[in-house]
Amino acid sequence: MRPVLAFFMLLGVAAARTSAPTAAEIMQKVAENQDRGQKERLAYVYEEHIDVITRHTNGKLAREEITDYLVTPTAKGVNKKQLAVKGRYLKKGQYQSFAGDPVPGGGEGLDGSIVESFRHDLTEDDSKDGLGKDLFPLSTEEQKDLKFELAGEQVVSGRKAYRIRFTPADRNELTWAGEALIDEEEFQPVSVYTRLSRRMPFAVRALLGTDVPGLGFNTQYKRLDKDVWFPVSFGTEFRLHAVFFINRIITVSMENRNFKRASVDSRIEYGEAAPPSQ
């Protein structure tokens, strides 16, 4: 009898050892990989394509700017060199098209300011992968005020992934909540979806006339090499109400593409390099 009991006890220990990690353990490994992976992501040159659109609430386009950048590694991070900019905007009932700098009305007026602000946020030079680090809870710093839940597993492009839900530890805090798919083998993000954890406070909506219904972000990642994953697409569309009279629908999309691994020597020269080959 004792050998039988011992056998089942060993089975229980083995099962415990092979059971899925907790959501907190999974995200801790993700954070460690993100913190450690900064150097690996600096080994790549790539192009960044950004499209920002503002529309009136009736759906009529107010302004659109499409910008392409070449992203290259530097000693302190990355350098983003603008390759092209084009777009159109509504002026006196007619659409005016433009290409190249200076951008007409860039940073001026309501729509020019909105477009420039979003474009600047997406092209911050401190980001190693083209996205502001405060948008997603992937690094150690961004995870400290969140709680996580393992919601299941699924297969994405032939690879198993954990489905992790996240919410603020303080339910009264206005910050990000959402869901992430995490690769089970390398503990890297496959996709991340975020939304505001709750509505704007009533006082802000009532007294300041400000709200952002539908605000959230959706990002897809791609595996370039072992333990090296990059965001390859980013998108959001939401409505902006601000100080009673500002009312716009804002659409933002970003695509990272044409990745090319840089050699040690090319890192020094890539500041003035030509775009990667198609």
Mark where each language-model region is.
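Hydrophobic h-region of N-terminal signal peptides that target proteins for export
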Residues: 8-17
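Structured extracytoplasmic
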Residues: 17-177, 184-190, 195-215, 223-232, ...
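Residues at the start of alpha-helices and the adjacent loop-to-helix junctions
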Residues: 6-8, 22
